[in-house]
Amino acid sequence: MQPAEFWKKDKIILYFFSALKYNPIINRKRKGTMIMKKWMAFLLAAAMVCMLFTGCGKSSGTDSDLAYVQDKGVLVVGITEYAPMDYRDENGQWTGFDAEFAQLFAEKLGVKCEFYLIADWTKKFVELDTKQIDVVWNGMTICDDALSNSSVSDPYVINAQVVVMKADAVGNYKTPESLSGLSVAVENGSVGQTAANAIAGAKVIPVGDQAAALLEVKSGAADACVIDITMAYAMTGEGTNYGDLAPGLKLTEEFYGVSFRKGSDMTAMLNEFMAELKENGTLQDMADRYKLTLAE
């Protein structure tokens, strides 16, 4: 509804109430009748307001999430620091498999790609629903929480939750039961946290993100961490900042997906675009560069 239109309708309502209040016929009725008339007036006014503003609760025929993004000219992509999916290069620019994928999709839509750092991963769907971001594109595991709170794309990368600890200790822990009594760092609200919670006797330590979970192990504040296997192999071992750490026991297998708002028409568009990139080999080339395994 346009502001001018709202003002006109607001003026009609005020006039209506004024007429009811000062109508001499109503004013000379008995007290009991006056009360009844006031209630009738209230109900009539309420009905009038409903009729006047029926159109306010309806869309103007542009419920399309795609149209919303194209109108503003930018796709805001929610991410965290998570190599090799999303991370900053030496120039401070966002790069990684997901960052490149998101930029290609933004080009397909004819809009700019803007990255937004999700400070609290547990609030990602709140950020999505309130339109702080348009999509969660950050190595997100397809799980019940994601399926309930968003529109999830087809799976595109195979992942697993893996236990990372000091390299010289990895061989001593080959079953979940063997981890009992250990302190295990996890990203708060992550699938890794769910996997760690299932380890009987483990002390689970929630932290801000997966990089922070690795740091807990490196510093000795935790015995182990549970993170995505994609990150574990990219961030640990010789030549990395975590050369003394290594991935060991695999706890779960899963798939990554991209989350849009519930009912978004961009989900189907991304699925079609993803199929094109798989067919022409673009997605496989990217997966090879980042040492990832594409979902079938």
Feature locations, PLM:
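Extracytoplasmic small-molecule ligand-binding "clamshell" domains
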Residues: 60-139
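A ligand-binding cleft/hinge motif common to bilobed small-molecule-binding domains
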Residues: 140-148, 195-198, 218-219, 223-252
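Bilobed "Venus flytrap"/periplasmic-binding protein-like clamshell domains
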Residues: 76, 81-84, 94-108, 159-214, ...
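Short helix-initiation/N-cap motifs at beta->coil->alpha
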Residues: 63, 115-126, 171, 188-191, ...
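Ligand-binding clefts/hinges and TM-proximal coupling segments of bilobed small-molecule sensing domains
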Residues: 58-63, 191-208, 243-250, 272-296
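Acidic, polar ligand-binding/catalytic clefts
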Residues: 103, 107, 112-178, 244, ...
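Short, low-complexity disordered leader/linker segments with a strong preference
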Residues: 1-72, 295-296
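Periplasmic-binding protein-like
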Residues: 158-165, 229, 233-275, 293-296
